[in-house]
Regions:
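Boundary at the C-terminal end of the N-terminal hydrophobic targeting segment
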Residues: 21-25
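N-terminal, Lys/Arg-enriched amphipathic/low-complexity engagement segments
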Residues: 27-87
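Short, structured beta-strand/loop micro-motifs enriched in basic residues and often containing a Trp
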Residues: 41-52, 88-95, 196-204, 298
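Short, Lys/Arg- and Gly-enriched loop/turn segments at beta-strand edges
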Residues: 74-86, 117-128, 227-237, 326-329
Length: 349
């Protein structure tokens, strides 16, 4: 098995993205240069994981470190052309990691800021298969009709113009879709020694298929085990709300992230934040309970950080919040409730 490369360096905050391949080498630490530490890690199909859980870390990160890494697409990069089929795929979404965050303990919060995400290749893939997708007959959601047949679409990516092209199978129609790279999967190890499939979204994050996991945003995750054990994968070039047929434009990604540990700050569910908004995530079934989780978490956040009473926050959210259906095809639904910071009082110090 090929040993992945890890490079640890102390560097300034402006870094080039990883190339498609990284030379094999042992960890290297350069001391004495002012600035943030940079950790580079290159993943291959031989060292990805398929569950969120306790596993040997591929690298250690400190609070404030920047990470440059890559992820495979949801199919393990094996679907490349018309003769390929879904039975070639090894398993669920392959994950890069885990990354051990030094000093992280249960009850802390891990903050991940997305600095740069780039599609790593010339095409993306979309597909559906019998029994998968929100409108496809399955054992647990039977419909009046047979399951839909397997189909695969390939999306040429134009990096210069920042678009991917949809080409219909059954006609000559095609249209360009703007790229919006994001991680479909990003999460930490769950509690209690549990190993959770990479296809499952839950309170540890996971397969949230959240377009919010993109450049300019910060994701907050609850720390459940020592070291947090951060995983990521399932890169998307673009996705419609709900990921209704079960896939986005699935792509490998190259990523630059920054991690930060918030000691003693406990949260129950994932959250996102950017310069303009705060966003709380609800992940469960049925859909109305996912909505309740998202809204109660948003209200709790406003109460804790912005000083409004819970009842005032409840009233304000009812008048000014928005919701986004990120995911409706996996074992849990994913809802994001957000509010613009212009509607909030100054943040408490």
């Amino acid at each position: 098995m090929k040993i992945p490369s890890i490079i640890v360096a102390v560097a300034l905050c402006a870094f080039a993205l990883l190339p498609t391949a990284v030379a094999q080498q042992k960890p290297v630490i350069h001391l004495g240069t002012p600035g943030a530490r940079l950790v580079q890690y290159h993943a291959t199909i031989h060292d990805v994981k398929y569950v969120y859980g306790v596993a040997a870390p591929v690298a250690h990160l400190r609070s404030g470190d920047m990470l440059e890494t890559n992820t495979l697409d949801a199919f393990g990069n094996v679907l490349q052309g018309p003769s390929d089929t879904l039975d070639m795929v090894k398993g669920d979404n392959p994950l890069t990691g885990p990354f051990y965050i030094e000093g992280a303990e249960p009850g802390d919060t891990l903050a991940i800021t997305f600095l740069d995400l780039q599609v790593d290749g010339k095409q993306g893939v979309g597909a559906f298969a019998p029994g998968f997708g929100a409108l496809n007959s399955s054992t647990y959601t039977p419909m009046l009709g047979p399951p839909l047949p397997e189909r695969i679409w390939y999306y040429p990516v134009d990096h210069a113009r920042n678009v991917a092209t949809f080409q219909a199978h059954d006609s000559s129609f095609k249209v360009e879709i703007p790229l919006h790279p994001f991680f479909g999967c990003i999460g930490v190890a769950p509690t209690g020694g549990e190993a959770r499939s990479s296809i499952v979204p839950a309170e540890n994050g996971g397969n949230m298929d959240a377009p919010e996991a993109s450049v300019g945003n910060t994701l907050y995750l609850p720390v459940n085990v020592p070291g947090a054990l951060l995983y990521m994968g399932d890169g998307h070039a673009a996705m419609g709300d709900g990921e209704v047929d079960g896939t986005a434009i699935e792509v490998p990604l190259r990523a630059r992230l920054q991690v930060r540990l918030v000691k003693g700050r406990k949260i129950e569910w994932p959250r996102f934040e950017n310069q303009n908004s705060i966003m709380a995530v609800g992940i469960t079934r049925p859909l109305d309970d996912a909505l309740r989780v998202a809204f109660t978490q948003l209200i709790a956040w406003i109460h804790a950080d912005y000083g409004l009473s819970e009842l005032d926050a409840y009233e304000l959210v009812s008048k000014a919040a928005t919701i986004h259906l990120d995911e409706m095809v996996d074992p849990n639904y994913v809802i994001v409730a957000s509010i613009d910071k212009k509607y909030l009082p100054p943040r408490k110090k």
